[in-house]
């Protein structure tokens, strides 16, 4: 279709809905306060920012910790303090346990039959049970330790070869995390791993990209006439072909001799074949959950590693203390995952990194399942809800010097990742808390300990710590706008 024709249709549709909005009755008399709405678009323009979590925090200073935004036709509530986050994810958790329906999640995750996007109900409960007890249990995560060790040994050899020259730390950690996740999820049964990873990033970018029809549900035809839906369906077909080959290869090789040798696809196929659930698991369910596993941690773990190293490069005293701890605890040639239990300061660094640099500062949106009341305001059913986890993490009422990187703040503190402390919710909380929490931490703590034990690190070209650019950008997650490039130097006493 000609671009001018598409443009004309868009304009005509928006004018129609603007008129419709002017005469549509307000179904709630007591919505939370919020910034003024522009005609047609409402508050969409206020989220068109490289750092929307910061924009929303600034708006909350003016309009309050619970705000109403009109994003096109989508009524949206934003909460920005620990108290209000607790109202959403604990007090009224069952009322806000749904996910908004999106065209992209329906296409890429087999009609949202995964764990992340599935609507709240019996199917979701059963699949989360599988995830918690089988796929991502602490025992299962430990069984992947050899995969992590093997990948970090490979990385170490590369860094030793490139010693004394700048390396792209950001790209290195992304590749490392992708390799471990693919091996843990798929085993050796993916001959198209490079293509699969490329497609996964395309999916993640699509899910996080601006899509006009997401804000105007009655304009879904725009995805058709613009060619977007055809493009998404083509991407999904390529992904499904790879997923189908993976299932065939797993079935051909037969079951693993014991559970410690199972990858995540093996686990799902075993559950599918043996039953034991209140639902009939199909191949589509298996593929949807596998895609969840592959996409959920792909960007967040590497982003946390990037920010942790960035803060250590900016704070040489912290770097020195962390390295001294690792090198005093580790007794052999290699860091083991058992050593992590004694790396107290390193764990504080990871905690503080995820507080100040939450990889997903705005948690995955929730949707109100029924009319309810929060903090004295009416929240109608189908309202989209955004929890600003980053704003909770820098809330001045909960944290001293909230904008400063101070790992010691967690010393002798009971605050943890588990979702009970609403001033600290990098993995979310309540029924929809991220089930991959243990796996995600294993992909941050162990690699970071490895990097600090085997190498000293310097900034390139004589750069000073305070000169390091920490400009943020939000795409799939919130990362450095410019990749972190640093110089590795193997410890002479440890180098081969």
Swiss-Prot record:
Known pathway: Secondary metabolite biosynthesis; terpenoid biosynthesis
Enzyme class: oxidoreductase
Keywords: Glycoprotein, Heme, Iron, Membrane, Metal-binding, Monooxygenase, Oxidoreductase, Signal-anchor, Transmembrane, Transmembrane helix
Binding positions (heme): 434
Reaction(s) catalysed (UniProt annotation): germacra-1(10),4,11(13)-trien-12-oate + reduced [NADPH--hemoprotein reductase] + O2 = (+)-costunolide + oxidized [NADPH--hemoprotein reductase] + 2 H2O
Protein name from the UniProt record: Costunolide synthase
Subcellular location: Membrane
Superkingdom, taxonomy of origin: Eukaryota
Required co-factors: heme
InterPro entries documented for this protein: Cyt_P450, Cyt_P450_CS, Cyt_P450_E_grp-I, Cyt_P450_sf
Stored PANTHER family: CYTOCHROME P450 (PTHR47955:SF13), CYTOCHROME P450 FAMILY 71 PROTEIN (PTHR47955)
TM region(s), chain numbering: 4-24
Any GO BP: terpenoid biosynthetic process
Positions glycosylated per UniProt: 26, 168, 280, 412
Entry EC number(s): 1.14.14.150
Topological category with respect to the lipid bilayer: Single-pass type II membrane protein
Source organism of the structure: Tanacetum parthenium
Family (UniProt): Belongs to the cytochrome P450 family.
MF terms (GO), sorted A to Z: costunolide synthase activity; heme binding; iron ion binding
Tissue expression profile of the protein: Expressed in floral glandular trichomes.
PROSITE patterns, per the entry: CYTOCHROME_P450
Gene3D superfamilies from the UniProt entry: Cytochrome P450
Gene name of this polypeptide: CYP71BL2
GO cellular component, as recorded: membrane
Function: Involved in the biosynthesis of germacrene-derived sesquiterpene lactones. Component of the parthenolide biosynthetic pathway; parthenolide and conjugates are promising anti-cancer drugs highly active against colon cancer cells. Hydroxylates germacrene A acid to 6-alpha-hydroxy-germacrene A acid, a precursor of sesquiterpene lactones that spontaneously undergoes a lactonization which yields costunolide.
């Amino acid at each position: 279709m000609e671009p001018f024709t598409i443009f004309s249709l868009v304009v005509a549709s928006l004018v129609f809905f603007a008129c419709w909005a002017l005469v549509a009755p307000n179904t709630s008399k007591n919505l939370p306060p919020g910034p003024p709405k522009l005609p047609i678009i409402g508050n969409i323009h206020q989220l068109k920012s490289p750092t929307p979590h910061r924009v929303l925090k600034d708006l909350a200073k003016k309009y309050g910790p619970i705000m109403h935004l009109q994003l096109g036709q989508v009524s949206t509530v934003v909460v920005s303090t620990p108290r209000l986050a607790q109202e959403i994810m604990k007090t009224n958790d069952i009322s806000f346990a749904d996910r908004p329906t999106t065209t992209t999640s329906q296409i890429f995750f087999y009609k949202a039959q995964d764990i992340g996007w599935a609507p709240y109900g019996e199917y979701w409960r059963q699949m989360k049970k599988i995830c918690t007890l089988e796929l991502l249990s602490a025992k299962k995560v430990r069984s992947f330790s050899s995969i992590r060790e093997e990948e970090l040994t490979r990385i170490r050899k590369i860094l030793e070869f490139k010693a004394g020259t700048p390396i792209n730390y950001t790209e290195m950690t992304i590749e490392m995390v992708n390799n471990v996740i693919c091996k843990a999820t798929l085993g050796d049964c993916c001959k198209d791993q490079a293509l699969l990873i490329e497609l996964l990033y395309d999916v993640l970018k699509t899910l996080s990209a601006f899509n006009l029809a997401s804000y105007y549900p009655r304009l879904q035809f725009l995805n058709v006439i613009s060619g977007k839906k055809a493009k998404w369906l083509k991407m999904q077909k390529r992904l499904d072909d790879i997923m189908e080959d993976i299932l065939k290869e797993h079935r051909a090789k037969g079951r693993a001799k014991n559970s410690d040798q199972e990858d995540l696809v093996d686990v799902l196929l075993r559950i599918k074949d043996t039953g034991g659930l209140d639902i009939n698991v199909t191949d589509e369910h298996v593929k949807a959950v596998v895609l969840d596993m592959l996409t959920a941690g792909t960007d967040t773990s590497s982003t946390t590693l990037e920010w942790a190293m960035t803060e250590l490069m900016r704070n040489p005293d912290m770097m020195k203390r962390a390295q001294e701890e690792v090198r005093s605890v580790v007794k052999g040639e290699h860091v083991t995952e058992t050593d992590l239990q004694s790396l107290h300061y390193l764990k504080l660094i990871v905690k503080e990194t995820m507080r100040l640099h939450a990889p997903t500062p705005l948690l995955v949106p929730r949707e109100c399942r029924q009319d309810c009341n929060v903090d004295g305001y009416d929240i109608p059913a189908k309202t989209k809800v955004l929890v600003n986890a980053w704003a909770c993490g820098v809330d001045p009422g909960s944290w001293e010097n909230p904008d400063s990187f101070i790992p010691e703040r967690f010393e002798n503190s009971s605050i943890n990742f588990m979702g009970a402390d609403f001033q600290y919710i990098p993995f979310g909380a309540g029924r929809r808390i991220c089930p991959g929490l243990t796996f995600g931490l294993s992909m941050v703590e162990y690699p970071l300990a490895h990097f600090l034990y085997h190498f000293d690190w310097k900034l390139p070209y004589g750069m000073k710590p305070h000169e390091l650019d920490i400009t943020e950008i939000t795409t799939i997650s919130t990362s450095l706008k410019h990749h972190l490039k640093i110089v590795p130097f193997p410890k002479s006493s440890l180098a081969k």
